[in-house]
């Protein structure tokens, strides 16, 4: 496991059932300085997610959020996603950023530190 204090930043993956929910979550967490930036992917056509839920194969159109943040904000970010999200079990997958442009990494840090 990677130690979070050694990470430059994190990218968090969250899927949403529609554009409105995705944009509401994105705007809220950026405004609250829990994220520096959120990319809303699949706005026009969505993306297809295939998974098993309640023992049935599901195929749903979803919107993907790519959330850029710092490791120290992950617990609060996860709690906020839980509060805002309509899914009973929202996706919350953290990808470590171990290398990135120095000025961009600093921008992420500065953006979430101002809150």
Model-derived features: positions:
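Positively charged, small/polar-rich N-terminal and surface patches that mediate targeting and assembly
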Residues: 1-115
